[in-house]
Amino acid sequence: MRTGLPSGTAAEVVHPPTGPSPRGLVVIPDIMGMRPLFDDLVARLAIQQGWSVAAFELFPGREDLDVADRLAAGSSLEDDRVLGDAVAAADLTGAETVGILGFCMGGMYVLKAVATGRFDSHCPFYGMIRVPDQWRGAGQGEPLDALAAGDAASVLAVVGAQDAWTPPDHVDELEATGATVLRYAGADHGFVHDPSRPAHRSGDAADAWRRVVDWLAT
């Protein structure tokens, strides 16, 4: 069901067929934001796992931006707004225990969400561990600083060993915080969530999903 967060940001929320669940999940999309791929993911997780699941748009009011424009606009995003929307989405689930996962830029914000203290578990898929130079702005903090301010042990991160957005030295830094990291040999950026992408690796994707769902369920 499409709804709006207090900020006005569009969100999708789905409860399991039995009604609202005591366990919830927030999903932060990749840089391209809300679209049928994520509507389907939210519904699938709600039905298969029995969780109340909410997702929201990263670029509210600018949904028509193409990928090049979104990449260029990364520096205009502010942590206070995005993380405020993440917390509001958690509240929208009505759940007692809430995890969070995200992809690409959304994964970066999952790491930053550690500092909010709102979420019980954090699962970034190929989220940037340091803010890319082209996205640095006055409202952007560093994910590693957020991890230092919260419970880094609540993080299970999924990364591809060939992903230029998460270079090995950054992944080492993430692991040193106490986060658990799953490194997939030969995998590039975006290898899990979108089967239409050339980078998709069905075997690795299935393994990553199994591990992430287990992490969120504990």
Predicted segment positions?
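Serine-hydrolase catalytic machinery in alpha/beta-hydrolase-like enzymes
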Residues: 1-95, 192-193
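Active-site nucleophile loop of the alpha/beta-hydrolase fold
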Residues: 58, 123-132
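Flexible "cap/lid" loop of the alpha/beta hydrolase fold
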Residues: 65-75, 128-152
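Short beta-strand immediately N-terminal to the catalytic nucleophile in serine-hydrolase-like folds
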Residues: 100-102, 125, 158
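Gly/Ala-rich beta-loop-alpha elbow adjacent to hydrolase catalytic centers
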Residues: 102-106, 110
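Short beta-strand/loop motif that positions the catalytic acidic residue
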Residues: 150-151, 157-159, 163, 184
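Conserved alpha/beta-hydrolase "acid-adjacent" motif
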Residues: 164-170
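C-terminal catalytic histidine-bearing segment of alpha/beta-hydrolase fold enzymes
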Residues: 179-218
